[in-house]
Amino acid sequence: MKSLRTLLKLARRDLETLRRALAEQIARQTALQDRILGHEQTIKDEQRAALRDYESGRAYGGYAAAALAVRRALAAEHESVGVEIDRLRALIAEAHVETRKFERLIELEEARLKVQREKREDAALDEMATMRLGRRR
């Protein structure tokens, strides 16, 4: 019984660790989305500046190539974080099932011990009643 409780504690700790990792990855994904939106806004600002000024227009070609590379890198990182989030969600589901198994085993063990205890009490009461009845005769 003690080992089941220890295993339950470990399973809960693992589940909590996975939940924290998921929260970190979600925060990372949110930060990446903010960076992507900021980068898109910067590209739009540079496009407007390139339309206003001839020199800016000439320099925009190099900037556009670099901006495209940054956009691809951010998109790839966003995708990898999404994959990691999906993986962590699957691990959390598995860890939750495992935790529930230990909880159920503990419940069954406690129910079994309760039945044994009630049987012992009933046997003791029956013995006392038999002894009492024997004394009356």
Describe each PLM feature range.
Residues 1-137:
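Charge-rich amphipathic alpha-helical interaction elements
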